[in-house]
C-alpha cells in the first residue's frame, strides 16, 4: 500500500491578525466609499484598531461612527434616486471588500 503525505494548502498561508484584517478592510472601504486613506482617520494607529476589537465593536459600527461624527458622504453613490441614499456602510459593503481584498474566498464559477 502506498501512502502519500498529507498536504494542506492553508497550512502554508500565514494567518492574518485581526488588526491586519481590519487595516485591509478599512483601507478598502474608506478609499472606495469615502475617498479617504487610513491615515485620514484615527485608525492609522494600530492601537485604536485593537481597542475597538477588544471592546467588541464591529467594523461596520466603527466606520459608521466616523461617518456620523464627520458627516461623511459616500462618493460611490451616483445619480438621482427617489430615495435618499444612506451614507453608512452595510454588511454587503463589507462582504464585497472582503472579496476584493482576497479575504473571502468564493467557489462560485
From Swiss-Prot:
InterPro entries named in the record: CbtA_toxin (IPR009610)
Result when mutating residue 65 to S: Loss of interaction with FtsZ, no effect on interaction with MreB
Knockout consequences: Single deletion leads to an approximately 100-fold reduction in resistance to oxidative stress, deletion of 3 type IV toxin genes (cbtA, ykfI, ypfJ) leads to a slight reduction in resistance to oxidative stress, has no effect on cell growth.
Pfam families in alphabetical order: CbtA_toxin
Entry superkingdom: Bacteria
Keywords annotated in UniProt: Toxin-antitoxin system
Inducing or repressing factors: Expressed in mid-log phase at lower levels than toxin relE.
The family this protein is said to belong to: Belongs to the CbtA/YkfI/YpjF toxin family.
Additional detail: Encoded in prophage CP4-57.
Oligomer status and interactors: Interacts with FtsZ but not MreB. Another group finds interaction with FtsZ and MreB.
Function: Toxic component of a type IV toxin-antitoxin (TA) system. Acts as a dual toxin inhibitor that blocks cell division and cell elongation in genetically separable interactions with FtsZ and MreB. Overexpression results in inhibition of growth in liquid cultures. Overexpression leads to formation of lemon-shaped cells; inactivated by overexpression of cognate antitoxin YfjZ but not when the 2 genes are coexpressed from the same plasmid. Also neutralized by overexpression of non-cognate antitoxins YafW and CbeA.
Record-given protein name: Toxin YpjF
Species of provenance: Escherichia coli (strain K12)
Gene: ypjF
Amino acid at each position: 500500500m502506498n501512502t502519500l503525505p498529507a498536504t494542506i494548502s492553508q497550512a502554508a498561508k500565514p494567518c492574518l491578525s485581526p488588526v491586519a484584517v481590519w487595516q485591509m478592510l478599512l483601507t478598502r472601504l474608506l478609499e472606495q466609499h469615502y475617498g479617504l486613506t487610513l491615515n485620514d482617520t484615527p485608525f492609522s494607529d494600530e492601537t485604536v484598531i485593537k481597542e475597538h476589537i477588544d471592546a467588541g465593536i464591529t467594523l461596520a459600527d466603527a466606520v459608521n461612527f466616523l461617518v456620523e461624527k464627520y458627516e461623511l458622504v459616500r462618493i460611490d453613490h451616483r445619480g438621482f434616486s427617489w430615495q435618499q441614499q444612506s451614507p453608512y456602510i452595510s454588511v454587503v459593503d463589507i462582504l464585497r471588500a472582503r472579496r476584493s481584498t482576497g479575504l473571502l474566498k468564493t467557489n462560485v464559477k
